[in-house]
Amino acid sequence: MAQISESAAIPRRTANHHGNVWDDDLILSLDSPYGAPAYYERVANLIEEMKHLLLREMEDSNHDLIRRLQIVDTLECLGIDRHFQHEIKTAALDYVYRCWNEKGIGMGSSDSGSKDLDATALGLRALRLHRYNVSSGVLENFKDENGKFFCNLTGDKRVRSMLSLLRASEISFPGEKVMQEAKAFTREYLTQVLAGRGDVTDVDQSLLREVKYALEFPWHWSVPRWEARSFIEIYGQNHSWLKSNINQKVLELAKLDFNILQCIHQKEIQFIVRWWRESEIAQLNFYRKRHVEFYFWVVICIFEPEFSQSRIAFAKICTVATVLDDLYDTHGMLDELKTVTEGVSRWDLPLIDDLPDNIKIAFQFFFNTANELAVEVVKKQGRDMIALLKANWQRYVESYLQEAEWIATRHVPSFDEYIKNARASSGMCIGNLIPLLLLGQLLANNIVEQIHSPSKIQELSELTIRLIDDIRDFEDEKERGEIASAIECYMKDNPDSTVENALNHLEGILHLSLEELNWEFIKQDTVPLCCKKFTFNIVRGLQFVYKYGDGLSISNKEVKDQIFKILIDQVPIEE
């Protein structure tokens, strides 16, 4: 690499990011009625009623296996499964697992000789997600002599079976060829059905909407809150496998639960808005204002009331990280950035006294927020973890300085060199660690080692976050004058490759990494599930907000509408 002199500087560039698309006063004016005790009482009563009704529904059927799986799937899609975890495990999944074998299952426990694709696919998906040991090899039983998947059913039942198979195929681990085959087959089949060119016509409209959702938002692109809002709108009173009185109660609970959670989330985003407005950084136009979008990213993934502190911490960290990103990418001279990096390394605020005011304000914003969050972590965990937090902030800003030096020297590193640095600059080293420590679990040192770098799940989350950003934001970053990206570095290592070749290569790495992440998330170990779920869902959340491009930097389009649906627009409830 070329030698960089102390006087070398990055020209002060302009990123031309759009301003805050949200009126903070509008956010602060939100006042949902769903915090009232009467709504909580109604939800509690509905939960108790439904526990008895659903247990009876599971048992009162010749198709007791698929009925149990349909109930579990419905509760999960509507976002209310957390109220029925005991019933889901003991009455549904334990029961299904006892009937499971290498050839699959039928619709009922009495159908020992008849295997059903819909029931088997639903079971494979649900059992895997709940950490039962089931093999994808069971799907080989649903291939014909030519190795093609088949389904003997017709009409809506055929479409439903293909949809269940698609959703099961997404919960794949590395090397599972049958899952890749199932995914390719069902996506093609359902795409044809949705276009009206399939072998089934006059498909139920609610079912078609489910198909559309599954094709538009595969599992790694879907998130719990968006799925719940979407399925509340899809879910009708015509779910023939549930009695009408249960249908009504399921839908009422889903709507009330969504609105009550939305009320809680509105109070949290109001807290974030006030925190932002009270900081000096809010008065500067140098930096992106995306505090609402960052809160949205985390709340669509981790929505339960008990994780409020982690959500707020994540939104704060991302807001600070974006200020640092803009500083290192756009506004800072190289000598200034070296001073900032040294200030973080030494945790020394006076060190930056001679820097321009906009940089001092940014550093003060970082310094205050990092210290406040460190105090919260120490209180929650009951021991001093300051050194660990400082080390990860240092790793983060040093990766930014490395990128700034590449820009200053017009240096494009090798792909491996870039990825090594990019893992740190993804921000997951700090954006994941602090919220995990605030989830409410006391985490022993050996557990922290299993969830934090260089653990496998942490390394995979860092890699996937960086690849998602580079793949979706490549053109915009190039226009802003950034030299090194995964695509540029791959093309340097492979001079004959095109941008399309590079993108295909990165998509392949991303796909494999997501399958590995599936395994790390689902495998049995000593790490608390809430910790693995947070890490895993944050990756899914970024896929979601980046689906149509960089939805965090360019948030005035699809993401703005999604934020409105999740945080502002109540689900209508008929009185």
UniProtKB/Swiss-Prot annotation:
Binding residues for Mg(2+) 1: 325, 329
Protein location: Plastid, Chloroplast
Record InterPro entries: Isoprenoid_synthase_dom_sf (IPR008949), Terpene_cyclase-like_1_C (IPR034741), Terpene_cyclase_plant_C1 (IPR044814), Terpene_synth_N (IPR001906), Terpene_synth_N_sf (IPR036965), Terpene_synthase-like (IPR050148), Terpene_synthase_metal-bd (IPR005630), Terpenoid_cyclase/PrenylTrfase (IPR008930)
Gene Ontology BP term (one): response to wounding
Primary localisation category: plastid
Coiled coil ranges: none
One Pfam family recorded for the sequence: Terpene_synth_C
Catalytic activity: (2E,6E)-farnesyl diphosphate = (+)-delta-selinene + diphosphate
Cofactor(s) needed for function: Mg(2+); Mn(2+)
Gene3D superfamilies: Farnesyl Diphosphate Synthase, Terpene synthase, N-terminal domain
Plastid recorded as keyword: yes
Chain residues that bind Mg(2+) 2: 325, 329
Name of the top EC class for this enzyme: lyase
Cellular-component GO terms for this entry: chloroplast
Bound cofactor: record note: Binds 3 Mg(2+) or Mn(2+) ions per subunit.
Subunit text: Monomer.
Family statement: Belongs to the terpene synthase family. Tpsb subfamily.
Record-given protein name: Delta-selinene-like synthase, chloroplastic
Species: Picea sitchensis
Gene name of the encoded protein: TPS-Sell
